[in-house]
């Protein structure tokens, strides 16, 4: 589904201190941007911010960067964080958002700058000629390895079984060890799950969610 252009979105996100409008200039300087030396975690394809806003609230000593392609999506993620701030009556200084094509992500983060990556319900790109666009594909995992620290974990959730099984091979081929895996997350023994908007919707439909944790060797 193609998003309708919202002309008001760009001015709104640029007015927010949660938005980094020149991310390439921050390469190697993200801790300075956050004004601390805390670990930095990424959510790739953060959508409307339901997931990352919960992380930011729970973990004030971790910095987060949410990435999505469209201004029309990020604007709602910023609003979601503001809503959460109002709810808990506390300003979150540990979150930034950027809009970009993730294919160019290694231009934004430097070696050993990132400590964890979350990938939730990304586009499965089912046609074989489009597989390289998958956020878990070996092509992109190679890019992530340019800026993640040793032993970094990638947490991956999806409702698409073909993507999930292909991704297991992508991780193994790219030098990651799969440390946890389940084909039914909500009925598993994994207790650290935070639900996304999609996940809550899928749960009401009785759909099973697949999840894995992969660690860079």
From Swiss-Prot:
Residues 129-134 are annotated as: Interaction with RNA. Pathway: tRNA modification; N(7)-methylguanine-tRNA biosynthesis. InterPro entries: SAM-dependent_MTases_sf (IPR029063), tRNA_(Gua-N-7)_MeTrfase_Trmb (IPR003358), tRNA_methyltr_TrmB_bact (IPR055361). Substrate binds at residues 127, 159, 196-199. S-adenosyl-L-methionine binds at residues 43, 68, 101, 123. The keyword tRNA processing applies. SUPFAM superfamilies: S-adenosyl-L-methionine-dependent methyltransferases. It catalyses: guanosine(46) in tRNA + S-adenosyl-L-methionine = N(7)-methylguanosine(46) in tRNA + S-adenosyl-L-homocysteine. This is tRNA (guanine-N(7)-)-methyltransferase. It comes from Clostridium botulinum (strain 657 / Type Ba4). The gene is trmB.
């Amino acid at each position: 589904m193609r998003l309708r252009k919202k002309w008001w979105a760009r001015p709104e996100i640029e007015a927010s201190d949660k938005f980094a409008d020149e991310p390439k200039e921050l390469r190697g300087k993200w801790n300075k941007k956050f004004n601390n030396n805390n670990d930095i975690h990424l959510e790739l394809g953060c959508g409307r911010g339901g997931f990352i806003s919960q992380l930011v609230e729970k973990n004030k000593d971790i910095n987060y960067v949410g990435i999505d392609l469209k201004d029309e999506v990020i604007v709602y993620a910023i609003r979601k964080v503001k809503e959460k701030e109002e709810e808990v009556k506390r300003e979150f200084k540990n979150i930034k958002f950027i809009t970009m094509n993730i294919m160019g992500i290694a231009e934004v983060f430097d070696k050993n700058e990132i400590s964890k990556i979350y990938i939730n319900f990304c586009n499965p790109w089912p046609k074989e000629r489009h597989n390289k666009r998958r956020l878990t594909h070996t092509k992109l995992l190679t890019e992530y390895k340019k800026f993640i620290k040793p032993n970094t974990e990638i947490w991956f959730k999806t409702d698409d079984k073909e993507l999930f099984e292909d991704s297991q091979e992508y991780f193994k081929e790219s030098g990651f060890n799969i440390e946890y895996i389940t084909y039914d997350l909500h009925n598993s023994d994994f207790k650290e799950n935070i639900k996304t908007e999609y996940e809550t919707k899928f749960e009401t439909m009785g759909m099973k969610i697949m999840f894995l944790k992969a660690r860079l060797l």
